[in-house]
């Protein structure tokens, strides 16, 4: 019929009708083609959704913190910290927890909250919280969807010793840069911070020096493992899809532990140095900061890029002389957080997605104060330490404009830091350990090249980044403190394989540091 109509038109002389008809025919064919394509796409899309919804998932439980009474949560609240795929919370809104009591079992729905609440995120695995209020007389808690068994949760309670300021540092790995870590510990300790370090691997002598400081606590930070019974493919390693050694999980874990004890918690990297400006110590600084921003749950201090000089020889090293050598590069980078812990339940590296209602995240102006990011290191052969350098600190110059006449630290503080450090490393066993610190860096140059490639160059901004993508050789004979851990797997929870960290500890070895 269509061909007959076309033939009649061709015999006629009304070319306008011919043109209109051809246009209608083409439009009809295009519409049919689009409809067919959409139908095929819709079927494929439905298959993808069906396959995702139907498949099982893995979660790795890192800790469960129980708060009998809390400034942040209702009484008898438990908080599970775990890792899973970044869309896990879109598929599951709750985890089912069975509380065993003397009167019988009680089921409690723990609400799932993503720590990094943005999709898509460049790492496939991210941290989560699951929060629920349990019976006061519970004997144990277990993750379960049946009445027979379950994965018993290893409960801990938060720290209770009051701390005005706690510094939760990002996890240390392959750590040998003693010039940095010793300075960080001395400076943060001087200004009143209690420091919590998470360690995956570190040279043993440096580990002992840090542990000796009364203002530090060190916890092992394990790479995560999923068992042979799993939803993921046998070759999949979730650590390659966790951002920077699972850093956001470590920071949130630290927040959960000090929620009831600390008035302020700051979350720096070890190469981020903050010197108080609004007060003589961190407590006064942060008190004033939150007075400036009364609605803040978190205040961001941006980082200003710097270069510094130091010595490879312990006898010539000075932490405050290193700071006095600082040169500002005029560049500002991503900020780091200070929080009021009762106002924030979790944190990412540069922001918190879990600030309680009524509060917000605010940014401290750089010209008021900022972290010194000790980014570029130089090790000249000429000794860097001299008293005149300590007594002549450079001016604070984040924009490289010579716009301020404010020294980066007070001379009296610098002299006290230097004196305390020298006293600590010149007595007893610490003197011997300090003298053994390495004069050659093995890991740092390799990590620096790797991180410049995968992170600072910004070439692969859309991919997950971490040390697992660095090629690090073994160094036999190098004494390191590494982490040993044990995980167990529970496979009877509906659609979820649960892998839980049940023990972790430090172990010394002489075959180098591991990831």
Swiss-Prot record:
- What's an example GO cellular component term for this entry? membrane
Name the source's superkingdom: Eukaryota
Where, subcellularly, is it found?
Membrane
Enzyme Commission numbers on file: 2.4.1.-
Keyword Transferase listed: yes
The membrane-topology field of this record reads: Single-pass membrane protein
Which keywords accompany this UniProt record?
Answer: Glycosyltransferase, Membrane, Transferase, Transmembrane, Transmembrane helix
Q: Pfam families, per this entry?
A: Glyco_transf_92 (PF01697)
List the GO molecular function terms: glycosyltransferase activity
Question: What is this protein called in UniProt?
Answer: Glycosyltransferase family 92 protein F59C6.8
User: Belongs to which family?
Assistant: Belongs to the glycosyltransferase 92 family.
Top-level class of the enzyme under EC nomenclature? transferase
- Record domain GT92: where: 163-456
Keyword Ribonucleoprotein (UniProt): no
Q: Where are the transmembrane segments?
A: 18-38
């Amino acid at each position: 019929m269509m061909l007959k109509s076309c033939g009649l038109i061709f015999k006629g002389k009304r070319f306008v009708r011919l043109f209109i008809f051809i246009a209608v025919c083409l439009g009809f064919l295009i519409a049919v083609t689009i409809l067919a394509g959409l139908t095929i796409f819709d079927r494929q899309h439905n298959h993808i959704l069906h396959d995702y919804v139907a498949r099982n998932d893995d979660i790795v439980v890192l800790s469960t913190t129980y708060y009998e009474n809390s400034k942040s949560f209702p009484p008898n609240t438990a908080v599970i910290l775990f890792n899973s795929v970044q869309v896990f919370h879109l598929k599951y809104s709750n985890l089912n927890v069975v509380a065993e009591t003397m009167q019988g079992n009680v089921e409690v729905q723990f609400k799932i909250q993503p720590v990094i609440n943005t999709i898509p995120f460049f790492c496939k695995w991210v941290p989560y919280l699951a929060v629920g209020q349990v019976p006061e007389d519970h004997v144990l808690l277990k993750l379960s969807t049946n009445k027979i068994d379950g994965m018993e949760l290893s409960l801990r309670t938060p720290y209770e010793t009051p701390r005005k300021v706690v510094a939760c540092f990002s996890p240390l790995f392959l750590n040998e840069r003693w010039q940095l870590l010793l300075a960080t510990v001395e400076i943060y300790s001087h200004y009143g911070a209690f420091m919590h370090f998470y360690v995956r691997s570190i040279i043993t002598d440096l580990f002992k020096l840090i542990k000796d400081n009364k203002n530090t606590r060190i916890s092992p930070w394990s790479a995560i493992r999923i068992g042979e019974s799993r939803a993921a493919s046998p070759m999949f390693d979730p650590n390659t899809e966790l951002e920077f050694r699972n850093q956001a999980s470590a920071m949130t874990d630290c927040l959960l532990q000090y929620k009831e004890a600390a008035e302020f918690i700051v979350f720096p990297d070890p190469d981020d140095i903050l010197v108080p400006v609004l007060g003589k110590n961190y407590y006064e600084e942060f008190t004033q900061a939150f007075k400036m921003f009364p609605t803040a749950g978190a205040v961001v201090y941006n980082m200003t890029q710097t270069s510094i000089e130091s010595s490879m020889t312990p006898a010539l090293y000075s932490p405050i002389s290193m700071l006095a050598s600082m040169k500002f590069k005029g560049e500002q980078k991503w900020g780091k957080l200070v929080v009021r812990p009762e106002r924030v339940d979790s944190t990412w590296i540069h922001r918190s997605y879990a600030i309680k209602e009524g509060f917000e995240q605010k940014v401290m102006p750089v010209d008021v104060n900022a972290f010194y990011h000790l980014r570029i290191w130089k090790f000249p052969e000429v000794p860097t330490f001299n008293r005149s350098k300590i007594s002549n600190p450079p001016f604070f110059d984040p924009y490289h404009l010579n716009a301020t006449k404010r020294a980066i630290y007070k001379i009296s503080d610098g002299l006290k830091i230097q004196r305390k450090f020298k006293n600590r490393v010149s007595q007893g066993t610490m003197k011997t350990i300090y003298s053994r610190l390495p004069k050659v860096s093995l890991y740092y140059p390799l990590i620096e090249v790797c991180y410049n490639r995968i992170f600072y160059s910004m070439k692969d901004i859309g991919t997950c980044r971490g040390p697992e993508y660095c090629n690090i050789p073994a160094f036999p004979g190098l004494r390191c403190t590494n982490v040993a851990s044990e995980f167990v797997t529970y496979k009877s929870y509906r659609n979820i394989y649960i892998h839980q960290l049940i023990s972790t500890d430090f172990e010394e070895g002489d075959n180098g540091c591991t990831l």
